[in-house]
């Protein structure tokens, strides 16, 4: 018997919506990365994109443990010498909360063309509304013990 290799055309992609209200950022990111990669499916293969689409709503209400809001920094670079900018997560969550969630998830997917394709299936919104109602997304509950 030969080893089964899934084809991208054979993969059925489901849409999931996740409410990030009071969910710890790292726990949220690991669950979303698992759905994006397709690791929850029996047909998972590390070299094929078998993941699902994920919509994260209420990104502005995500929780950070400890004193990370003030201490943890998010870096970006302009590409010019001396162009490294650092922003605290408190400021990032205030101005661009969807970027904070995307940055956490990006660190948990592969750093290659497959990871970039998986990140394109991620949609993050700061508020409770999203424009993907036509896809009929299923609710995905993240169960966590007290933070």
Curated annotation (Swiss-Prot):
GO terms for molecular function: mRNA binding; structural constituent of ribosome. Pfam families: Ribosomal_L13 (PF00572). One of its GO terms (biological process) is negative regulation of translation. Keywords: Ribonucleoprotein, Ribosomal protein. The keyword Acetylation does not apply. GO terms for cellular component: cytosolic large ribosomal subunit. Belongs to the universal ribosomal protein uL13 family. This protein is one of the early assembly proteins of the 50S ribosomal subunit, although it is not seen to bind rRNA by itself. It is important during the early stages of 50S assembly. Part of the 50S ribosomal subunit. This is Large ribosomal subunit protein uL13. The gene is rplM.
């Amino acid at each position: 018997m030969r080893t089964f290799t899934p084809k991208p055309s054979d993969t059925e992609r489901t849409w999931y919506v996740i409410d990030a209200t009071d969910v710890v950022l790292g726990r949220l990111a690991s669950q979303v990365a698992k759905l994006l990669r397709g690791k929850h499916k029996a047909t998972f293969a590390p070299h094929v994109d078998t993941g699902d689409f994920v919509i994260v709503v209420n990104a502005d209400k995500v929780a950070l443990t400890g004193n990370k809001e003030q201490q943890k920094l998010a870096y970006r670079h302009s590409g010019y010498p001396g162009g490294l900018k650092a922003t605290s997560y408190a400021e990032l969550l205030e101005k661009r909360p969807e970027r904070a969630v995307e940055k956490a998830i990006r660190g948990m997917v592969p750093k290659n063309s497959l990871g970039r394709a998986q990140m394109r299936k991620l949609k993050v919104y700061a508020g409770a509304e999203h424009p993907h109602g036509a896809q009929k997304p299923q609710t995905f509950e993240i169960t966590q013990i007290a933070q």
